[in-house]
């Protein structure tokens, strides 16, 4: 969970994250994953990563090393708003699917401004970009499965809907998948 990796003394980062878990059950069907794009660039490893820090246990005075999430917010924001739309466009182009065919874009719930910026860059209405960030914060890799489950339970997804799921994370890594529900 994210709370175990958060540096609670870093006020610019700790307030953004929440704990959550997500999973998906997949099976062989006629529909499903239509296309996938997955990329990484290690040159950005320093702006979003885990860093080790030695701490001292106050009870027994022994030192221990603990890894904490480290994030430089501005570079991550700029990376996401530039890279996610390109990745979405690439997955659609590879699949020969038009934006008008997409019911929803389900993005990693990192930051509402990132999601709004991606919608604007793709020239798509924000209604096609559901968000639950205000409920849970950034739950890291769990954010897309949690949102997908909520949408399914709320009757927002119908058989045959085309969805684009897209996320980014440490390293820096990013990707998108086009699927038919």
Question: Where are these predicted regions, by residue range?
Answer:
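Condensing-enzyme catalytic core mediating Claisen C-C bond formation in acyl metabolism
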Residues: 8-78, 82, 86, 168, ...
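Acidic, glycine-rich active-site loops and adjacent beta-strand->loop/helix elements
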Residues: 1-4, 29, 39-41, 135-137, ...
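Stable alpha-helical structural segments in soluble proteins, enriched in small hydrophobic residues
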Residues: 87-95, 147
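Acidic-glycine-rich active-site phosphate/pyrophosphate-binding loop
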Residues: 1-2, 55-62, 114-126
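Claisen-condensing/thiolase-fold acyl-transfer catalytic domains that form or cleave C-C bonds
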Residues: 85, 103-181
């Amino acid at each position: 969970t994210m709370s175990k990796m958060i540096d609670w003394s870093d006020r610019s980062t700790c307030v953004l994250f929440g704990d959550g878990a997500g999973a998906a059950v997949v099976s062989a069907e006629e529909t499903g994953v239509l296309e996938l794009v997955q990329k990484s660039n290690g040159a950005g490893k320093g702006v979003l990563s885990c860093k080790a820090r030695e701490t001292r246990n106050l009870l027994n005075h022994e030192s221990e090393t603990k890894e904490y999430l480290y994030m430089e917010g501005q570079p991550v924001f700029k990376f996401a708003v530039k890279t996610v739309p390109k990745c979405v466009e690439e997955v659609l182009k590879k699949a020969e699917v038009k934006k008008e065919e997409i019911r929803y874009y389900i993005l990693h719930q990192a930051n509402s401004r990132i999601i709004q910026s991606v919608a604007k860059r793709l020239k798509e209405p924000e209604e096609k970009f559901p968000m639950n960030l205000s409920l849970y914060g950034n739950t890291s890799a769990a954010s897309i499965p949690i949102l997908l489950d909520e949408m399914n339970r709320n009757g927002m997804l119908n058989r045959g809907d085309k969805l684009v799921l897209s996320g980014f994370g440490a390293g820096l890594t990013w990707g998108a998948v086009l699927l038919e529900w």
